[in-house]
Amino acid sequence: MLNEYTSFRKVFIMVSPQIKDGMVPAISFALPFLFAPIIVFSSLYGGFSIIIAPLFGYVFITICDFLIKISLSNPDPNSKKNLVYHKAVLWLWPLIQFFLIFWCIYVISNHQHLSVGESVFLMMAQGMITGAVGITFAHELMHQKSSKEKWLSDILMGMALYGHFRTEHLLVHHRYVGTDKDAVTAKYDESFFSFFLRVLPSCFKSAWEEELSRLRKINLPGSSLRNPFWRYGILAAIFLILSFAIGGSFGVLLFFTQAFIAILHLEMANYIEHYGLTRKLMSNGKYEPTKPHHSWNANHTASNLLLINLQLHSDHHAKP
C-alpha cells in the first residue's frame, strides 16, 4: 500500500513549476462559459443531449489533458500585470450560473417534454457545473480583498447551500491544513465516503465556532448582524423561495439536487488536495509552516483552464 502511495505521489505532486511568462490570457479561463449553451440546448431537446455537459466536463477535458503537454510554467508572483480581464471572468459567472439553475427549474416545471429521469439528470449536470465551476470561482473570489467580490462568492456558495464554506476555508482550513484541527485534510487510508460523512457536520461546526470566537473578541454575541451566517442563511433562503415560486415543491427538490451534487464535487476536491499529508508538530508546540509538499498538485493544461488553476494547490497555500 505504501509503495502505491509513493507512486501516486510521484505522479501527481509536481511542485515548484518553472516561472516563465506564465500568464494565461483571460479568455482561456472563459472555457467554463461553454457550459451555458450546452445546458440550454439539453434543457430544450432532452434525450441524449442531457449527457453532453457531463461528457464535456468529465470525458472531453480529461482526453485533452492526456493529449496536451503538461504545463510546468508559472506566472511571476511579482508581476504587475493588470488582471481586470481575468477578474471579469469571475464577476460574470454568478449571473450565468443563476440563469442556468433557474432556467432549468423553469423549463422542467413548466414544460412537459422532459421525463422525470431526464429532469433529475439535467439538474445533476447543472450540479456538476455549480460545483466544479461555481464553487471554484467562489473560492477564488472569497480570497479577494474587495467586499463586493466576497459578496459574489457568497452568492455562488448560496446556490450550493454551502455558504459556511467561506468561513471554514479562510479561517480554519488555511490555518490548520495538514493537522487534526482541519476537518478537510483527508486521513491516509480514509475512504471518500467516510470523509464525506465526517466533513459535512464538522465543517459547519468549525465555521460556526470560529465566527463565535471572532465576535467574542470584539464583545459581540453570536446573534450579531456582523456574523456572516446571517448572510449565508438569507441567501440560501432566497434561492429556495425562488425555486418554490418557479417550480413549487418539485422546484425545491430540483434545486436541492444540483446543490448536493455541487457539494459532492467540492468535497471530492478537498479529499484529494491534501490526502494523507500532515504537518509536523514542532518542539515549540506549533505546527511547521505549510510547504509545497503539503498539497497534491496536477499540472494538466485543460482541466486547469476549466478550474482556473485550482489544481496548482501548493501555489494557493503559499500565497492565498
Where are the regions that the model predicts?
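Transmembrane alpha-helical segments that form the membrane-embedded catalytic/substrate-channel core
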Residues: 59-68, 126-142, 163-166, 199-207, ...
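Alpha-helical bilayer-embedded segments of polytopic membrane proteins, i.e.
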Residues: 20-68, 84-109, 117-131, 224-268
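A beta-strand-loop signature enriched in Asp, Gly, Thr, and Trp
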Residues: 248-295
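All-alpha helical catalytic cores of prenyl diphosphate-utilizing isoprenoid enzymes
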Residues: 197-240
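Intramembrane catalytic core of multi-pass membrane enzymes that act on lipidic substrates
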Residues: 76, 81-200
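Membrane-helix interface/capping segments
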Residues: 67-82, 278
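Membrane-proximal soluble regions of multi-pass membrane proteins
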Residues: 148-215, 278-320
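Short, Lys/Arg-rich, polar N-terminal cytosolic tail immediately upstream
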Residues: 7-20
